Amino acid sequence: MKEFFRPVISNALHSAGITTDKQIIIEQPADKKFGDFSTNIALLAAKECRRNPRELAQTIIEHLSFPPDTIAKIEVAGAGFINFYLTPLFIMQSVEQVLLDGDEYGKGESGKGEKAIVEYVSANPTGPLTIGRGRGGVLGDCIANLFATQGYAVTREYYFNDAGRQMQILGESVRFRYLERCGETIEFPATHYQGEYIGEIAEELFNDHGTALADSTDVQIFKKRAEEIIFASIRKTLERLGIRHDSFFNEHTLYTPDAGGVTGNQRVIDALREKEFIAEYDGATWFLTTKLGQEKDKVLIKSSGEPSYRLPDIAYHITKYERGFGMIVNVFGADHIDEYPDVLEALKILGYDTRHIKIAINQFVTTTVDGQTLKMSTRKGNADLLDDLIDDVGADATRLFFIMRSKDSHLNFDVELAKKQSKDNPVFYLQYAHARICSLLRMAQQEIGFDATSSPELHLLQRLTSPAELQLGSALLDYPDMIKTSLRLLEPQKMVEYLHSLAECFHRFYQECPILKAEPDIARARLFLSVATRQVLRNGFRILGVSAPESM
């Protein structure tokens, strides 16, 4: 809908002789008394035009030319905002389009022909998924859904960290528990994984092999079994939340030599060395980030010979370019904030265009139960497990609570609130709006034979002119722009806020506008408006990955 205004305003600027390099920004006022749409272009352009913003706004209005029956009123407000009020006819004609488009309403083609890769979760297979990892998983899944709505060919990838020191520690942890099961006395290291699941994996190995592995010093046997069992558990947990991946990239491939005998990690070192950004000192290999203005260089290969996280991350991103992805999206936890800029700098040095890399950092999660905050530590074995949360509140509440706050904000997951069957629970509130409409339509079919698929009757919508009807209709028109905003910001929370506002509009409409008791044509028109609302709720729920119950 915002694209409806931009060319008209641009033409008005041109015909009025107003030259500006400022972008035409169209906003949707939260309070509809300030219009259905608004622009601050007069405020932005006033300084370079050396004119009073309100006077400039009035000049722009005088040169606006909209199609007939679309704009009811245009006014200058405040310091120089231009507010636009849509006609009831235009609003309801647009609602007709919602019904005609159905599941396709809100989708676009801005990404048509483009390949996008969204990487998310990518948890080390060292233990069951924690609640913190779950937030990133839901965020990534929703972001991938948003890209898909705009025509991108989306690949959902899990970076499978099956190499590195943590996996070695995992194997050692299982081996120690296995030796204990064999009857040996072991001083279990405090630095290793303590959870009960380690003992359960060791028990499986003992059941399969007895004491035959007791003399083996090959940690890989234990690591491999642990990796298989834990990753199967991770995938099962993700499936419970409706989180899927199309591709699993194994980190060990970056350590595997190609036909020429060179690993992906080594190619990065060689390429950076050629650019004179590599040095060896203190027994380690360093990325010379001091040449980029940073205070310290960053280690790529430790003195132990083990790569730091930065090196395989750089090599991994190069594979994304090599696979032809024009849009690269990474969903990370807050623990990646310090590391990731170095990865981008390395890619720039090596000649890769990083403008098409988007990063979504999600902050930490704490879980509150009866006012008590739970602690999380996979290593110590007292992790706050994602499976337990799903068992407690369900998949829908888990997903929606993870994204109902900005990804940039710390999230306090209130378990008791998530289980409430009242309007205080945002999940219940949204789903109840959908269920309420479904119940209404069942009654309408029984009492007046209403057919929600009857396209020839859609013109009846144009008879709706009350404030509650127009507010709901106008809210439905905001949906396509809200998808684009959520995608641009990589912020599904915006979609949650929009759907909550839409549900509020519907509940107000339901209270103020009698439906089945209205005169026949008005009743059918209001029912069509309800069907359109149900459609937009469903479309939004599909992006967020939550169910749309027909009864509650």
From Swiss-Prot:
Alphabetized GO MF terms: arginine-tRNA ligase activity; ATP binding
Motif range ('HIGH' region): 123-133
Keywords in alphabetical order: Aminoacyl-tRNA synthetase, ATP-binding, Cytoplasm, Ligase, Nucleotide-binding, Protein biosynthesis
EC number: 6.1.1.19
Name of the top EC class for this enzyme: ligase
Keyword Protein biosynthesis appears in the UniProt entry: yes
Known catalytic reactions: tRNA(Arg) + L-arginine + ATP = L-arginyl-tRNA(Arg) + AMP + diphosphate
GO CC field: cytoplasm
GO terms under biological process: arginyl-tRNA aminoacylation
Keyword Lyase among UniProt keywords: no
SMART domains in alphabetical order: Arg_tRNA_synt_N, DALR_1
Localization: Cytoplasm
InterPro entries named in the record: Arg-tRNA-ligase, Arg-tRNA-synth_N, Arg-tRNA-synth_N_sf, ArgRS_core, DALR_anticod-bd, Rossmann-like_a/b/a_fold, tRNAsynth_Ia_anticodon-bd
UniProt family annotation: Belongs to the class-I aminoacyl-tRNA synthetase family.
Oligomeric and partner information: Monomer.
Protein name: Arginine--tRNA ligase
UniProt organism field: Pelodictyon phaeoclathratiforme (strain DSM 5477 / BU-1)
Upper lineage: Bacteria, Pseudomonadati, Chlorobiota, Chlorobiia, Chlorobiales
